[in-house]
Amino acid sequence: IITLFIFLFYQSYSLIGIVGIVLAFWIISNNVIILFQKRENLSNGMIVAHLGIGLLILGITGSSVWQEEKIIRMKVNNETNIKEYNIIFKEINEIKGPNYFALQGNFFVYDKNKNIITKLKPENRFYPVTNNFTTEVSIHTNLLRDLYMVLGEGNLNDGWIVRIYYNPLVIWIWIGALTIFLGGLISMNSNLKKLQRLS
């Protein structure tokens, strides 16, 4: 049911996506069941680590199969869409940092019900000491996706190049990696206790 919900939500049915999501939830569900059954012959650390592998596969599948990128030139008050989000370029401001000057874009992100979700503020920075230009990405994250915005070159007359990235399930890559690490710590602690009992 959860797998079907994910496909309906992202509106994509690629073979790689199907295999990845089914495999991920098979690993996750099996290890959750085993963990609650508390089988004495199985290490809790190993079960937790395997659970992390399932979460990792979930994140990698989502971020590689359903990612979307949009590159567009926008002027202030222009709007664009990516997936279910409407993005409005509200304003551009000059700001001064401790060792840089920057142009900061202010973008409002709305959902399909016209509720504001977040404000993204990507920057285009100039460091006079090193004579370097850099871009500062603005990110909004939740459990279903990451939304990135990058402000490129431009001016008030022609507008600015804006890069928008929609990356689903990215946070589950990090949660999966941390869960694998936690499983390793649990196994290490369990092995140390066994050694102490034997000594």
Enumerate the language-model features and the residues they cover.
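Contiguous transmembrane helix-bundle modules in multi-pass membrane proteins
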Residues: 1-82, 87, 172-199
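Residue-level detector of functional hotspots within protein domains
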Residues: 39, 46, 66, 93, ...
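Short beta-turn/strand-loop junction motif enriched in small, turn-promoting residues
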Residues: 61, 92-95, 167
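Soluble non-transmembrane domains of integral membrane proteins
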Residues: 70-160
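Juxtamembrane/start-of-transmembrane alpha-helix segments at the extracytoplasmic/lumenal side
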Residues: 161-175
